[in-house]
Amino acid sequence: MHPPGFKNFLLLVSSLFFIGLSAAPQSFSPSLRSLSGAPCRLSRAESERRCRAPGQPPGSALCHDRGRCECGVCICHVTEPGTYFGPLCECHDWVCETYDGKTCAGHGTCDCGKCKCDVGWSGEACQYPTKCDLTKKISNQMCKNSQDVICSNAGTCHCGRCKCDNSDGHGLIYGKFCECDDRECIDDETEEICGGHGKCYCGNCYCEAGWHGDKCEFQCDITPWESKRRCTSPDGKVCSNRGTCVCGECSCHDVDPTGDWGDIHGDTCECDERDCRAVYDRYSDDFCSGHGQCNCGRCDCRAGWYGKKCEHPKNCPLSAEESTRKCQGSSDLPCSGRGRCECGRCTCYPPGDSRVYGKTCECDDRRCEDLDGVVCGGRGTCSCGRCVCEKGWFGKLCQHPRKCNMTEEQSRSLCESADGTLCSGKGSCHCGKCICSGEEWYISGEFCDCDDRDCDKHDGLICTGNGICSCGNCECWDGWNGNACEIWLGTEYP
């Protein structure tokens, strides 16, 4: 039993509801909702119009395809790193230009995809100072890349900064020195960057999973997991950390274009022929002493020979250790690093060179010569690699006179290095020439400014004992070559 007037109240509510429906737009959809969750009072067409950029026709992207439209309002979302914002999701905090790795070159702020430059700066990335106090010469010098080419021949120099040539409007040339050209990534057939299957960075394509090729033009018919499995070496590393896995096959790095020491090969790049350098025998000018073959960096010795370098004959009554010990003498190296040890006896090298001699090749009279071949500066004699100077002279090569006709002031002025320091603080001055400290054997050079430890070594010897270290570089004696003078180019060894 309803109270009196309840029936009249229901009639009033019903009539108001139907009046509201008749006043609503004909295309009103109860499924549209406002941000508050209440039904949207806009038609679908009007809601979408408000979510489109001005001037865009019906059916075009809503919210720049970066969000969803709710009752005429864009709710932006993220589909890649960064944040979308703006009334129509038209702004992105990563789209501003960068220069030298900095957004707006660090001289402005990013405002909806465009740099707002600080006072005194201009350019799309705020990279150009409005006033330039550099000379053209200095400006051009600052614009040179590592090959000394101004703006990589792909732009012009403005006050020490490169402006890349992007007259086509695509902006594919960029970088501090315009060194990056993403046109290299465009597929000739599809005219798409990386064939539409990868990202381009500085002219190189980085392909999506399942695609490979210089421009991601080839599709792989195996799963990424299977591809990785096929490329994994026995030690569990993909391509032994020496190559790139492409669709289940390893492309090994080209580590030695000269071919001097071999390359990397094998199904999983497990074989590094550079390791053969450790078994190269400079006295036989061959790997494995000429008595074996280097395979994957190790010697496979022929019958009758054994050892790391196949250097020990099996018919020798001495063990390898005994043989090496007899050849060492007082040196840490067999035959003082200047000869071949076989069955406890040293054969000094180079062959036929009487300047290297001794039971363990301990004497090397080449050390008494300068680069012109003059022994002890013409002022002494050589005895087992050391100069015995004539009266009135001293020094490693008898290069210093004991009497000096200079004043101390004149002498010191000739011993000062470029920074004004006397003999670089590592030696003493005598008659206008620096005598480097004997306590630090590795200090050398006209002003004691060189460190002989910077020279290459082989078999534990600087310049392999076959040359002179000259300020970090090996100057090899006749018949020897290589960064460490380790390669014999003279007559064939017997």
UniProtKB/Swiss-Prot annotation:
Region (Cysteine-rich tandem repeats): 51-494
Annotated VI repeat ranges: 276-326
Per-repeat ranges for I: 51-95
II repeats: 96-142
A GO biological-process term: cell-cell adhesion
Signal peptide residues on this chain, from the entry's feature table: 1-23
Domain I-EGF, first and last residues per copy: 40-90, 91-127, 132-179, 180-217, 220-270, 271-311, 316-362, 363-399, 404-449, 450-486
Start and stop residues of the VII repeats: 327-367
Record text about domains: Contains ten tandem EGF-like repeats strikingly similar to those found in the cysteine rich 'stalk-like' structure of integrin beta-subunits.
Entry protein name: Integrin beta-like protein 1
Species name: Rattus norvegicus
